[in-house]
UniProtKB/Swiss-Prot annotation:
SUPFAM superfamilies, sorted: FomD-like
Protein name stated in the entry: Nucleoside triphosphate/diphosphate phosphatase
Xref: Gene3D superfamilies: FomD-like
Cofactors: Mg(2+)
Function description: Has nucleoside phosphatase activity towards nucleoside triphosphates and nucleoside diphosphates.
Location of the active site: R23 (proton donor)
Record InterPro entries: DUF402, FomD-like_sf, Ntdp-like, SA1684
């Protein structure tokens, strides 16, 4: 399949380890694709949960996926500053239908003041036992938590102000020319 181009809209689908669909985001504008990474933005996009519940995101969010890392990053742009929601997840794949990944439950939330919280450890442990996450998967995920925290602490990639400014401005340019 051809990679989506700048300005194209894609869906994002999150799955669980057992293959069940977890959550879908309907419209994310692609801002950049490379061999390994996808950067996009969505704003007031429809989200559908696995139980059929639907809701709409409240603010613009830049998304970052990379094929070499077991996490993805959502930077929510709010009046009080940027908050981040980071999912520990498989590297993404892209097909005709959507950008897809497996959500491995653990999340890191970063508040505008820099405070970090590791979330959903209980859910991770329960699903690890239920779906028999391998020792290798567990090792990879824990190593990627360390990489992620290092990126956060050092303002690397999506955690830098410049990144947010560049990509959110690009989104606004593209969105207003439609």
């Amino acid at each position: 399949m051809n990679a989506p181009k700048e300005g194209d809209y894609i869906a994002i689908q999150s799955y669980k380890h057992d293959g069940s669909l977890h959550r879908t985001w309907r419209d994310t504008m692609v801002l950049k694709t490379s061999e390994n990474a996808v950067i996009g933005c969505n704003d007031h996009t429809l989200v559908t949960e696995s139980d059929g519940r639907k809701w709409v995101t409240r603010e613009p969010a830049l998304i970052y996926f990379h094929k070499k890392y077991w996490f993805n990053v959502v930077a929510m742009i709010r009046e009080g500053g940027v908050s981040y929601y980071c999912n520990l997840a498989s590297p993404h794949v892209m097909d005709q239908e959507a950008l897809k990944y497996i959500d491995y439950d653990l999340d890191v939330k970063v508040f505008p003041n820099g405070e970090k919280r590791l979330l959903d450890v209980d859910e991770y442990e329960a699903h690890s036992a239920k779906w028999h996450y391998s020792a290798e998967t567990d090792r990879i995920l824990k190593a990627n938590v360390k990489v992620l925290v290092d990126w956060i602490n050092n303002g690397k990639g999506p955690f830098s102000k410049e990144y947010i400014d560049i990509w959110y401005n690009r989104y606004q340019e593209l969105a207003h020319h439609r």
